[in-house]
Amino acid sequence: MTAISRTAVCDTSPNGAASVPRLLCASPLLATAMMFAIGGCDRTVPPPTPLQSKQITSQSAQPSERSSLNRRGQQLSDEAARRDTTAETDPATTPTEPPFDSKPQTIHRPDDQRPQHDDRRLAEAGIRVYESERLKLYTDMDAEAARALPPLIDAVYLAWVEYFGELPPARDGSAFQMNGYLIRDEALFREAGLVPEDLPLFEHGRHRRNEFWMREQKYDYFRRHLLIHEATHCFMTYMPGVAAPVWYIEGMAEYFATHRIESDGSVHFRVMPTSPEDFAGWGRITAIRDGFAAKQGQTIRDITDWNPRDFLKPEPYAWSWGLCQFLDAHPRYRERFRKLGSLVQDRAFHSEVADLFREFEHELNTEWELFSTNLQYGYKATHAAIDFQSGTPLTPDQPQRRIPIAADRGWQSSGVLLEAGQTFEITVSGRITLADQPKPWESEPQGITFRYFDRRPIGLVIGCLHTDANSATDKPLPVLPTTMRKDFAIGRGCSFTASHTGTLYLRVNDAWNSLDDNRGAVSVTVERSRADNEAARKVDRRENTFQN
């Protein structure tokens, strides 16, 4: 949580005239030839950064052992520097390796190349400037709304530094600042010379070095969201040699931009949106749900294979946000994922991601499938996280097991392996409390029918089977019987014949955004059917006789 600083904001002119937004384009012919719909931020490549803007630190290594640097000037081994990368910048903008120098040198960020504008002349034309420590905002929009935007960037800057690390200092000692251009009347900005002739077309926003351009938005929330999104790009990519792939660059810009401002003025970034009304104009959760409804669900591999051209449409922004949100909020994966924040300009980024995905491949694919199919506003990632525990079979000597299942968590392992073709008796007892408002609702294992979730009463105990890693699939659609999306109702109890071998997982049915206020646990007993248990005893006796 960060409080928005009360930074002085410069207001130098009266209200500017509003007009209907148009695509930024130098000519009608070019607009006709290049018009296309792009959602979210538009991909662009910054012009070359002068090589003298960045210095390096070299130690007493031989020339053949020279090291490269990450975004904070930390040295990388020659082995790490050879790892395969996919930089999201034009190769022409990537600086060549400076001559070897054994003397330590100070690392500086690239020089500030923002143009100097005549703010008084712009004010006379109807374009105001609002300035804080980190943002100089030029806009022709309403003064009251515009005045609050630069302090928001000052607040998110602190969150960037905490997550990614501080940028190297400027050569002249100045603070890092951006220019933002928030546009209602395109012609006004173009006539004022605030839109570069070589700036590619965009529908919502575009950035270049420490400048960004964005259109005025219908909703207050999405105006702030887009502002933070573009500013995040400026911060993440200002140092040369970006190694992080496009899904991470766009996903993290979306992730930081999802924010909530409290009544006391404090602001939270990287939040899970709670409702379409409070996050008006954003729509990423709806896009993911619509994608699954259209049988266009995306796997982790699909998302990480995307290139910049894929982001000429809006859906990849939603899926990239979803993957970053999932990995950063999940208690099992977030520590490893957050290490990537210091590797944006580091060639080790790709090997670190590969190690993360390889180490947790089966669990990741399983939980991503569940996350992306169950995603809803207010989704509780911590409560939904699964503690995977492989089960063991019941035996004639231990024909049953009893397991507590908490009401405030998602899927929980029973520790029992159900074998294909075997029939099991599952019984449940106990009472739990669902929600506190408008009053506490008590439920038994069969659930309560005053409210339903996924077409079942909330409070109903349900189960599913989780297969071993060698049976994993990374394809979330269609529903396969070997995935945890194929669940079944248990209630007070049921007789269940396993169609395939897997560990039994259980949970109390409730919306994924409502788990945190549930209390209590039910007791679940799992045992073989009488016939199967007797058959198992006969097999056990025959094996003992043979061994003797």
Q: Can you name each region flagged by the protein language model?
A:
Residues T49-D90:
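Post-signal peptide N-terminal segment of mature Sec-exported envelope proteins
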Residues C25-G39:
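Bacterial N-terminal signal peptides
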Residues L434-I490, D532-N544:
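Surface-exposed beta-strand/loop patches in noncatalytic accessory domains
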Residues A123, L194-K218, F222, P240-K380:
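Acidic/His/Gly-enriched intrinsically disordered linker/tail segments
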Residues P99-P115, L122-P245, R260-S263, A294, ...:
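Juxtacatalytic substrate-recognition/specificity segment
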